[in-house]
Swiss-Prot record:
GO terms for biological process: mitotic recombination; negative regulation of mitotic recombination; regulation of transcription by RNA polymerase II; stem cell differentiation; telomere maintenance via telomere lengthening. It holds the Pfam family zf-C2H2. The keyword Protein biosynthesis does not apply. Embryonic stem (ES) cell-specific. Expressed in only 5% of ES cells at a given time, but nearly all ES cells express it at least once during 9 passages. This is Zinc finger and SCAN domain containing protein 4C. PANTHER family: ZINC FINGER AND SCAN DOMAIN-CONTAINING, ZINC FINGER AND SCAN DOMAIN-CONTAINING PROTEIN 4. SUPFAM superfamilies: beta-beta-alpha zinc fingers, Retrovirus capsid dimerization domain-like.
Amino acid sequence: MASQQAPAKDLQTNNLEFTPTDSSGVQWAEDISNSPSAQLNFSPSNNGCWATQELQSLWKMFNSWLQPEKQTKEQMISQLVLEQFLLTGHCKDKYALTEKWKASGSDMRRFMESLTDECLKPPVMVHVSMQGQEALFSENMPLKEVIKLLKQQQSATRPTPDNEQMPVDTTQDRLLATGQENSENECNNSCNATEANVGESCSGNEMDSLLIIQKEQHPEHEEGNVVCQFPHGARRASQGTPSHHVDFPSAPTTADVPMEEQPKDLSRENISEDKNNCYNTSRNAATQVYSGDNIPRNKSDSLFINKRIYHPEPEVGDIPYGVPQDSTRASQGTSTCLQESLGECFSENDPREVPGLQSRQEQPISDPVLLGKNHEANLPCESHQKRFCRDAKLYKCEECSRMFKHARSLSSHQRTHLNKKSELLCVTCQKMFKRVSDRRTHEIIHMPEKPFKCSTCEKSFSHKTNLKSHEMIHTGEMPYVCSLCSRRFRQSSTYHRHLRNYHRSD
């Protein structure tokens, strides 16, 4: 298997997960358990060198993961190979693959014999168009190879005396072989960004433009000799594994390609602030292209990438067209930067609109309302205050025409007018009360026997407080003492009257 070239993942439960680089400092010997490199002991680093500390950390991590004192060289290599195979992303179910590895007894030969292509994901294709040349490439194919093959296809379609006799072979097998030869040398250069150095055959003001369309899978449309089929989830071409796949449909001429695929003359002028904002919003999704240093200044090599969702439309002529429904992202190399390319693509004369991006001039700006003194905005508040002062008593009693500010005050007052309610009226003296509790307290006066009776003299009282005051006579208790003359009093009312009459000046 082509992808079995580096570490394996989650094979030993007690091992650390780590992926070493190609230039690992571990030296493998025939007998690793007896090799001096496996028994190397580091002295403490006193110089504070970060490189030394990093190497020591990697050494310990590798030894803890691979355990060279317990495993043979073949076991460690198998562990590394399976780890890298899982990291390539081609496997459908990593858990199932790990279970197969355990079932094979960690034997790579038996493990490879039990494998089938069902464990791999189907290849994802990307539709690429450059100057009228179209093809389907594997998502992991280097962008430099894509541009090179499209140029060869373009030169093969031109009716020149040289290529009429010797046509360029652009078959699928040749493209696969080319991608496999060059992918190993370029895999380290495409980890974070896609690099394209074009301009090998540029002449004059010729422009090499590349259109990469990301589309979803829909039923294919066939009309005439052109068949367009776009797989689901296609991503832009980049470097990766050495397995590449390319399909070339019939190459239409430049006139048959839609106008939006044609390159534009991108200039450095008339870049407004809104275009800079548009660039800042979409620069994370755009593909970066770096031009070579050997390209003359009068040659312009640009990369034009559209990220779209393809939906079928009625077919026109010999070529079916789709409607892009996503924002256009463009990046340019050589003489014009990415920001200027976006500024030209979204110019004022361009009728296309970018969803989610609104110009500052189109955004509604609400005028601030000043609430200063004597301002018109304060008129509603002033009228409200005047009305509140004028109509302070909003609740009027229908019986006596009294005014009240609050509804609860009016309802409490209206209880006095409810003569028909017997619970508020004293039956004996016909006195009206606001609350039933007040009426009940009052009715004790009319009772022949008062409920509270003194235990000493058997005198009865209507209220309990009166009984307590009476009992102080029998006990001789005088709790209230004057601080000025030391006189004692039985009731608080008598004490306060004494203070007013005799100690007012004090």
